[in-house]
Regions:
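Ubiquitin-like/PB1-type beta-grasp interaction modules and other compact soluble beta-rich domains
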Residues: 1-81
């Protein structure tokens, strides 16, 4: 089934996307499909997206796991700090 997925972007991703956006996705789909769809929306973000992690329900998920519900997705870019 195709559904709308809410995505929240953090940090450097906000240079390329709004803090919150929605994409349409055919479920079930691997989480890497979210990144694929975002690359189509903004190809300039591809390098950064290749290094991002996805979180759902406050837990990181493997990109190969299947997304089966329309729960929100949080896209976390790499960060450094001290």
């Amino acid at each position: 089934m195709e559904t709308q997925i809410q995505i929240t972007c953090f940090a450097a991703l906000r240079k390329f996307f709004d803090p919150q956006l929605n994409i349409r996705l055919q479920l079930p789909a691997a989480y890497h499909s979210v990144i694929y769809e975002l690359k189509k929306l903004n190809p300039e973000a591809a390098d950064l997206l290749d290094h991002c992690r996805i979180a759902v329900n406050e837990c990181f998920v493997p990109l190969t796991d299947l997304k089966t519900t329309d729960e929100p997705v949080y896209l976390i870019p790499p960060s450094s700090g001290g």
